[in-house]
């Protein structure tokens, strides 16, 4: 088994440019040394509830949040820290100028993780001209568990079912 610090040298993490800080990311960055020092972080029902409550507490039904929390903690009591290391030190994790395939970026109106400014900058840098950006009203970060979840499915279905361009000039 390897330790996360073997993959992420401390000097590389601290010198990597990061995205604009949302309040949630700014708070999370304070814990970056802990995330680097451990391979896993606890996954609790309280944490799952915080995902839904931190940005805009009324975007999801309480019974949906509770059912989701129960299902997640039934799978495992911890999750890898790698995604937190990446979001605290390496955003964006891919170079948008190398993305040449059709791309859809969806952002919840109340998302406290992915800032509008960061996503729009990323979107503008995409190499593909076949791209769409959409803001989903009344949705925070966990879009599939929100009250407006049908909007998510509609946007995805529309994107994947649209006809290919006849002319590209």
Which positions does each model-derived feature cover?
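Active-site nucleophile loop of the alpha/beta-hydrolase fold
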Residues: 1-9
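Alpha/beta-hydrolase
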Residues: 10-94, 98-101
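Alpha/beta-hydrolase-fold serine-hydrolase catalytic core, especially in secreted/extracellular enzymes
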Residues: 21-25, 30, 129, 147, ...
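Short beta-strand/loop motif that positions the catalytic acidic residue
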Residues: 99, 105-107, 111
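Conserved alpha/beta-hydrolase "acid-adjacent" motif
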Residues: 112-118
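Catalytic histidine-centered segment of alpha/beta-hydrolase-like enzymes
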Residues: 133, 139-153
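Hydrophobic "lid"/C-terminal helical patch
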Residues: 156, 160
